[in-house]
Every structure is written in C-alpha cells, then in structure tokens.
C-alpha cells in the first residue's frame, strides 16, 4: 500500500511529459531517405558507362 502513492505520482509525471521531440530541428537533421536517394543516384551514375564516361571522363571504368 505504500507504493500506491508513488505509482500514482509516476503515472501523473508520465502523462505530463511531452510526446514529441522537444529539440528544435537543425540543418543536420536530414531524413535518412535523402541519403539513400543520393546513394542510389551516385551508384546509377557510376554503373551507367555512357553517362559516366561522357559527363565525367575520369570515372569511366570500361577502357
């Protein structure tokens, strides 16, 4: 019975806690999906010999 008041107080504290991220977003908070998109685009460019060799001659892997 002694733990009951403590339990109630903890429940009240949890209910009043913010349910969202209270930190402000910065420029570094970029979604992971944009990193994946950039990676896919880079790999597609590197694996496409026509596009890679003509746009960036230094990255041509095929002779």
UniProtKB/Swiss-Prot annotation:
Location of Isoleucine amide modifications: 62
Propeptide span(s): 23-49
InterPro entries listed in its UniProt record: T-conotoxin (IPR031565)
Tissue expression per record: Expressed by the venom duct.
Compartments (UniProt record): Secreted
Record keyword Metal-binding present: no
Coiled-coil parts of chain: none
Keywords, sorted A to Z: Amidation, Cleavage on pair of basic residues, Disulfide bond, Secreted, Signal, Toxin
Top-level taxon in the UniProt lineage: Eukaryota
Keyword Cytoplasm attributed: no
GO molecular function: toxin activity
Modifications the protein undergoes after translation, according to the UniProt entry: Contains 2 disulfide bonds that can be either 'C1-C3, C2-C4' or 'C1-C4, C2-C3', since these disulfide connectivities have been observed for conotoxins with cysteine framework V (for examples, see AC P0DQQ7 and AC P81755).
A GO term from the CC aspect: extracellular region
Signal peptide: 1-22
Family: Belongs to the conotoxin T superfamily.
Domain notes: The cysteine framework is V (CC-CC).
UniProt protein name: Conotoxin Pn-B01411
Originating organism: Conus pennaceus
């Amino acid at each position: 019975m002694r733990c009951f008041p403590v339990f109630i107080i903890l429940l009240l504290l949890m209910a009043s806690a913010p349910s969202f991220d209270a930190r402000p977003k910065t420029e570094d908070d970029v979604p992971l999906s944009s990193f994946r998109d950039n990676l896919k685009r880079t790999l597609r460019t590197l694996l496409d010999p026509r596009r890679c060799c003509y746009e960036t001659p230094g990255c041509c892997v095929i002779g």
